[in-house]
Amino acid sequence: KEKNMNYKINRRRSFKEWIVEEYEATKLLFRSIPAGLLTLFVVAVVTMNILANKTIVQTTYLALDGGFLISWLSFLAMDMVVKHFGPKAANKMTVFALLVNLLVCFIFYIVSIIPTPYEDYTVFNQIIGGTWFILLSSAIAFISSGFINNFLNYGIGTMFRKNPNGKTAFFTRSYISTFVGQFCDNLIFSTLTFMFFAPIFWNGFSWTFIQCLTCSLLGALVELVMEVLFSPLGFMVTKKWHKTGVGEQYLAYINRKI
């Protein structure tokens, strides 16, 4: 009997079993993540990609797009989910937000190409229709930086063995992972959009690498400041989650022994 139990525990799952378990875990996860946080996260992701269409500052050594004004909220939400549910859960939430963003962009594009007999909607169509390479650059940057942020946040958290649920642990892991993640997000997006695609499709408009680098650094610093301002709220919310048992069913499912 003991031998059979060890076999069940140690045997490798089949691909079908893995798919079924991941499906069940994902269903439980999205039932467990508070709807308010998930909504804010998705709205932030969709909004920052629309705002990224506008360059608000451009000098010889500096350039900033509008997306940095809201992107900090998405990283704070990811940090909170990593802390309570784990990095895998945050990655799934990141992928979900990306898929929603792609759907919204597709709907915007369809609306932008529908002809209308009324006033000129050229500017409106350009804004909501977006540009395919901005969407592509944004998707690559977001998914890459999201995964970097989530795993880095979790990794730093494992270093706090004495008081992993304390303020110091939460703030340290959030600040470091947010700065690194935001820098990667900004650099990947600005390099792909303004150095690779824009010179080809925007009549020669472009940023230099110095501008991309300074944009990435300054954007990460500004977003870090926002994280510092609002992370105490994030800490209090995650502490309340722990106290009230938010996501217990999901956590029990992923921590069970097979």
Predicted regions and their residues:
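Short, Lys/Arg-enriched N-terminal segments with co-localized hydrophobic residues
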Residues: K1-N4
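Hydrophobic transmembrane alpha-helices
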Residues: N6-L98, L102-L103
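Hydrophobic alpha-helical transmembrane segments
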Residues: A35-T39, L69, T94, L135-L136, ...
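Transmembrane alpha-helical segments of multi-pass membrane transport proteins and ion-pumping complexes
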Residues: V45-I50, F75-D79, N101, C105, ...
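Transmembrane alpha-helix boundary signature
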Residues: I50-Q58, F106-D120
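Membrane-embedded alpha-helical bundles of multi-pass transporters/translocases
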Residues: L98-N101, I113-P117, Y121-S145, T158-N165, ...
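Cytosolic juxtamembrane regulatory segments of multi-pass membrane proteins
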Residues: S177, G181, L251-I258
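A structural feature that tracks compact, well-ordered secondary-structure segments
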Residues: T178, N186-A198
